[in-house]
Curated annotation (Swiss-Prot):
Active site location: 130 (n6-amp-lysine intermediate)
Protein name, entry field: DNA ligase B
Pfam family, one: DNA_ligase_aden
Organism expressing this protein natively: Klebsiella pneumoniae subsp. pneumoniae (strain ATCC 700721 / MGH 78578)
Gene name as annotated: ligB
NCBIfam families in the record: PRK08097.1
Keywords: DNA damage, DNA repair, DNA replication, Ligase, NAD
PANTHER family with a match to the protein in the record: DNA LIGASE, DNA LIGASE B
HAMAP family, A to Z: DNA_ligase_B (MF_01587)
Presence of keyword Zinc: no
Residues in coiled coil: none
Family: Belongs to the NAD-dependent DNA ligase family. LigB subfamily.
């Protein structure tokens, strides 16, 4: 229900429970003058987005990004008092149509514990999906739809009656108890099997608002439907209420309204609707008491009988604390953005790999910027967009590029980063698949027993591993056993661990090879393999004859590794 839109109506509507230390951390380390400047610029941008939303139904950013940047603005206002007036937000266009019963809006609760506390000592509780669209009042008199009113400020809104009558899914005639009724609900974009966890919000709210504002969108209105979530002064029994609504053609609220009495039930429905196909976009759940106060006492911001628990965000807006550069196993310079730590899904995110220097420069990411971060496959953070840039640009100068795919097989002080990256790669599932070994372990092993080259760990003894700080006797024995098992890995795994630049499609044809056969191949012979062209063939020959690579192959031969 139109919670995010409510935020666009002014800062007063922001629920304090959402302004948490976990979501928004400490104040930026800026002088007061700069803090006020940055806060003022963010405020101006949010006002511009809000005006575009209200006037044209356009959305410059997603609803989630808008909401999170609005919270950021509230934080910065506390950090830098006097940056912007607190009461100068653009008010929503209220229109001339007065709601017969005010829209209360819904209070957002931050987590399961907050919902459990809210539910305590309450009875006759019901749960509904928090449908993502735009809120509307439907007024029926003597069986006819006489008014449809946009939410506006909760007291007055735009007259949408003519547009609403063009929506096929809206009942135009009512009988019985609904013949003279006021209904509140959500106009939504009908979807076929929408799974929120997979697809996200799709900016559904702005799309619906745009359709209702466009004079040329009559045909497109057939895409809209309505979820009735309140019948002020209707039957006191929720089951009776939903039965009558369903009989009148409002099928969704009855289908998706269920009794709950325990927080465990609320959590189960929330997970179910988050992961299951639904006919609409939703961004959380609503828990409400079945018995509501008389409609005459309803007031914006005063709906104590209902609360929202949103789904986990698909992305977070996170502030860049620092930019640093790292060297990958191929010698490529990578850019890493250190972030203000936040939780995303069940992961604590505090850094993101931006990629190459050229991509970083293209994205124009500086310290203090706001990035939209989501989780890609295997829970790896990624940059979706730069949603806000600071006025003052602070971007470090990247170091000169002096490493490549054939450097740092042997440890030297200046090679520490690329050398570590090579170790991380060779122990991964894509190469030797050394169980239980990753970046942290390689770091402590290298500190305790400095390795000469990337395969020196094969010569470590049980006693040396057990002497590494943080490694118990049992774990040291286990690690030595894992290292020993790796010796039996197929030859192709070892050359992959070394970093041979062979395409995936050609790997199968190398399984019966050995080092001497590979080293004897000419560029012309390499070009006969799938995916190997002139440049790749030249790289393969250079790799196989590089002195450091040849030295490693000879050392592996001395260790009796298969194929060497």
């Amino acid at each position: 229900m139109e919670e995010g839109t409510a935020m666009r109506k002014g800062g007063w509507w922001l629920a304090l429970g959402m302004f948490s230390a976990s979501a928004l951390a400490t104040c930026p380390d800026w002088p007061l003058a700069r803090g006020r400047q940055e806060t003022s610029r963010l405020h101006q941008q949010i006002v511009a987005w809000k005006e575009a939303y209200w006037r044209q139904g356009a959305s410059g950013v997603s609803d989630d990004v808008y909401d999170q940047l609005t919270l950021r603005l509230a934080q910065w206002r506390q950090c830098f008092p006097g940056a912007t007036p607190e009461d100068d937000d653009l008010p929503p266009p209220t229109g001339d149509a007065r709601h017969p019963v005010a829209h209360t809006g819904v209070r957002k609760l931050a987590d399961e514990d907050s919902v459990a506390r809210w539910m305590k000592n309450k009875s006759d509780l019901w749960i509904q999906p928090k449908v993502d669209g735009v809120a509307v009042t439907l007024v029926y008199r003597q069986g006819r739809l006489v008014q449809a009113i946009s939410r506006g400020d909760g007291l007055r809104g735009e007259a949408w009656t003519a547009r609403a009558r063009q929506i096929p899914a809206l009942a135009k005639v009512m009988t019985g108890e609904l013949a003279d009724s006021v209904l509140q609900g959500e106009l939504f974009l009908r979807r076929d099997g929408h799974v929120q966890q997979q697809t996200g919000g799709m900016n559904a709210r702005a799309k619906v608002a745009g359709l209702m504002m466009r004079a040329d969108a009559a045909a497109a209105l057939s895409q809209l439907d309505v979820f009735i979530w309140a019948w002020p002064d209707g039957p006191s029994d929720m089951r009776r209420r939903q039965q009558l609504l369903a009989q009148a053609g409002f099928k969704y609220s009855g289908q998706y309204t269920h009794p709950v009495s325990r927080i465990e039930q609320v959590a189960q429905w929330r997970q179910r609707w988050y992961r299951s196909p639904l006919p609409f976009v939703s961004d959380g759940v609503i828990v409400r008491e079945g018995r509501e106060p008389p409609g005459r006492v309803w007031s914006p911001g005063k709906g104590e009988w209902l609360a929202a628990w949103k789904y986990p965000p698909a992305s977070r807006v996170m502030q860049v604390r620092a930019i640093r550069f790292s060297i990958g196993r191929s010698g490529r310079l990578n850019v890493v953005a250190e972030l203000e730590p936040q939780r995303l899904d069940d992961k604590r995110v505090q850094r993101v790999n931006v990629g190459s220097v050229s991509r970083w420069q293209m994205l124009d990411i500086g310290v203090g910027d706001q990035l939209q971060i989501s989780l890609a496959g295997q829970g790896i953070p990624r940059v979706d967009a730069v949603v806000w840039r600071t006025a003052e640009r602070h971007k470090p100068t990247p170091p000169p590029a002096k490493f490549n795919a054939l450097t740092c097989y042997f440890a030297t002080p200046e090679c520490s980063e690329q050398f570590l990256s090579r170790l991380i790669w060779l122990s991964s599932k894509s190469a030797l698949n050394v169980d239980g070994v990753g970046e942290n372990l390689w770091r402590v092993i290298q500190q305790q027993n400095p390795m000469t080259h990337i395969f020196s760990w094969l010569a470590l003894t049980v006693e040396q591993l057990q002497a590494v700080p943080g490694i118990s006797a049992a774990r040291g024995q286990h690690l030595w056993h894992q290292f020993d098992l790796v010796r039996k890995r197929p030859f192709i795994r070892w050359v992959l661990a070394m970093g041979i630049p062979v395409p995936q499609g050609a790997l199968a044809q190398l399984e019966s090879e050995n080092w001497h056969l590979l080293a004897a191949k000419s560029e012309a012979q390499w070009r006969t393999l799938p995916g190997v062209g002139e440049i790749r063939a030249r790289q393969l020959v250079a790799f196989l004859h590089h002195p450091d690579v040849v030295a490693l192959a000879q050392w592996l031969s001395g260790q009796r590794i298969p194929g060497f």
